[in-house]
A protein has these predicted regions:
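Short secondary-structure boundary/capping segments
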Residues: 92-94
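Short loop/turn segments at strand-loop or loop-helix junctions that form parts
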Residues: 7-9, 105-108, 147
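A conserved mid-domain beta-alpha-beta active-site/ligand-binding segment of alpha/beta enzyme cores
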Residues: 136-153, 163-197
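N-terminal beta1-alpha1-beta2 submodule of the flavodoxin-like/Rossmannoid cofactor-binding fold
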Residues: 1-89, 178-232
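Charged helix-capping and loop-helix junction motifs
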Residues: 77-86, 125-128, 160-163
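Short, electropositive alpha-helical surface patch
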Residues: 58, 62-63, 116-125, 156-171
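Short catalytic/ligand-binding loop motif for oxyanion handling, primarily in non-cytosolic enzymes
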Residues: 13-14, 69-71, 111-113, 152-154
Length: 232
C-alpha cells in the first residue's frame, strides 16, 4: 500500500509537533510527504499536478493543526480546487474511488474537552463530519483520525509511543487492528530497528511489542473463558 501524507501548516519550522512528526517519518518507498505551503509559497496550486499525484497512492492522509475546527487556508483551497467535478466526482469523476482518506490532527486542547460537557462540547467525530462527507462524496474510504492532543505537554515516553503510532498509521494496512500493529512491531525489530533506530528506541519498541503481545494473549484467554462459560 502506497501512502501520501499531505501536510499543511503556515509555518512548519516553528511547530514542535510538526517537526517531531517530520523527523519520525518512516524511511520507506511506500510512504511520501507533500508539504503544501512549501510547494506553493505563492498560494497558486497546480491542480493537474496534484491530481496526478493522488492517482499514484492508495491512502491519502491530511496532516494539519486542527484550529477553529478546520484546516489551514491553503488546505481548504486545495480541497476546493483539486477535488473538482469530473475528477473526484460527477460524470467520470471516479479517479479516487476506493482509495483511503484519513486525518492526522494536531490539537492544542486536552482530549477530555472534546465531549459532551467538555470545554469544546463536541466530539472529534462530530467536528470532522465535513471531511467524512468529502470522503463519501468522492467515494474514498474514511479512516478513523489519528489525533495528537497537547503535544508540548507530552512526556518523552508518550512521544516515543506517538512515534510508533504515527509510523503504524502511515505503513499498516489496518492501523486499528491489534494483530496488524503487533506484526508491525515484530517486523520492525527483525528488519528496520537494527539498522535505523538507536538502542533506546529499539529497546522501547521491544518493550511495547512485548506488552502488546501479552495484552493480546490475556484478551484472547478471557474471550475463550467467556465462550466456554456460555457453552456450559
Amino acid at each position: 500500500m502506497k501512502t501520501l501524507v499531505i501536510i499543511s501548516h503556515p509555518n512548519i519550522n516553528e511547530s514542535s509537533s510538526q517537526q517531531f512528526l517530520v523527523q519520525s517519518f518512516p524511511d520507506s518507498r511506500e510512504v511520501s510527504m507533500h508539504y503544501l505551503e512549501g510547494t506553493y509559497p505563492n498560494g497558486k496550486i497546480d491542480v493537474k499536478k496534484e491530481q496526478a499525484l493522488l492517482k499514484e497512492y492508495d491512502r491519502v492522509l491530511f496532516q494539519f493543526p486542527f484550529y477553529w475546527y478546520s484546516s489551514p487556508p491553503l488546505l481548504k483551497q486545495w480541497f476546493d480546487e483539486v477535488l473538482e467535478e469530473h475528477f473526484a466526482f460527477g460524470y467520470r469523476g471516479n479517479k479516487l474511488q476506493g482509495k483511503e482518506f484519513g486525518l492526522i490532527l494536531i490539537i492544542g486542547v486536552g482530549e477530555k474537552e472534546y465531549q459532551t460537557g467538555g470545554q469544546e462540547g463536541f466530539s472529534i467525530s462530530e467536528l470532522t463530519k465535513p471531511y467524512q462527507a468529502i470522503a463519501k462524496k468522492i467515494e474514498m474510504h474514511y479512516l478513523k483520525p489519528l489525533t495528537i492532543f497537547q503535544f508540548p505537554y507530552m512526556t518523552e515516553a508518550d512521544r516515543m509511543k506517538l512515534l510508533i503510532r504515527y509510523q503504524q498509521w502511515l505503513m499498516i494496512e489496518k492501523p486499528d487492528s491489534l494483530k496488524a500493529r503487533e506484526a508491525w512491531m515484530v517486523n520492525q525489530l527483525d528488519e528496520t530497528s537494527r539498522e535505523t533506530l538507536d538502542i533506546a528506541e529499539s529497546s522501547f519498541i521491544l518493550e511495547q511489542a512485548t506488552e502488546k503481545i501479552e495484552d493480546n494473549r490475556i484478551e484472547l484467554d478471557e474471550l475463550r473463558m467467556h465462550i466456554d462459560n456460555n457453552d456450559q
